[in-house]
């Protein structure tokens, strides 16, 4: 049975409240998508020394993620804009979710089977294409289907699913890939889980309102995703920039964690795998504990104060990890980091949903995720180069220096949030 959409105006946000189960079904695919990237964060770090050598590992990760991000930046808003006007028996978004997910599974198999840096990069870039082909349309569901008073809760659920996906992906990669040594099985398993969550979405979500009338060619719609009119939405642009820097901070910790464990603390792969199970579990718990209170607080005091608090927690957390003399101390600061990440994931998405126009949500959400996708490559380009440069002097200091640089990203994210007008728009 499908999840019925809330009654809606011809254009604009629905008005009738949705049951909690319906909100959960709108969020489950976030788990599947993020499980892939959480797992690959570990798998690709584990493989990079063998693919390009220890001295070039940071640059190798940076190059691969930059190429993948360029692909995501082109695909996601373009396909999101096209899906706004798509008419099919399944609705506007579902065809793209199905096609993208099926190709994800195929490309993960190819990536798992590849043994050269060039082949791994090629499959990674193609995976970014297929994943964003699905994600661009999918993230239009909350603005399409959720009434304004439930956006905070829906965003909190989305945040929980994102974190759970990242954590479970890390678990799969750490247990199957590092501890048991089967990188191939770990990689393929990620695609299987994503496929299950996609099928749940396709089965249970009713997309509700139809596409608006299409008065332009498909080419014009696709290119309109990049129209300069977006610059007139100044609060939206400032929020995009703020999101970029916050996520650069989180991407640095996640993207360089295995290097940190190996080089800064001298852990073996088995020891690192165990810590990679514990640290994400701590992040998951702290995120879960902070997400829903943060969403409720944002409904009372506003979205921006909660995001400011998240930036502070993130900066203190990652700086503490970078300076920690031992893993137990680092884990204590991971708690602060997780609390900040949970608060941000719950509230940033709600603020974005509040301020964008409601008739072309696929386009605006697609562009927003361009900045989300760009955060990882930019962070790893800066962090990877920093790690290699400092590591040439003292190997263990490289990841620590990268984490301290990342603390600055959170501060910049807070500053860029100041010009954002948080008032809700329903047009």
Language-model regions: role of each:
Residues 9-69, 237-242, 246-266:
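Helix-loop boundary and gating motifs at the non-cytosolic
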Residues 54-67, 185, 266-284, 398-400:
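Loop-to-transmembrane helix entry
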Residues 44, 133-146, 343-357:
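Intracellular juxtamembrane helix-capping segments at the cytosolic ends
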Residues 71-73, 152-174, 369-380:
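Glycine-rich segments within core transmembrane alpha-helices of 12-TM secondary carriers
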Residues 112, 195-205, 404-427:
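Multi-pass alpha-helical transporter architecture, strongest
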Residues 92-94, 177-192, 385-408:
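A membrane-interface helix-boundary motif in multi-pass transporters
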Residues 2-19, 207-241:
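Juxtamembrane intracellular "pre-TM" segments in multi-pass secondary transporters
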Residues 93-109, 305-320:
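Structural signature of the two symmetry-related core transmembrane helices
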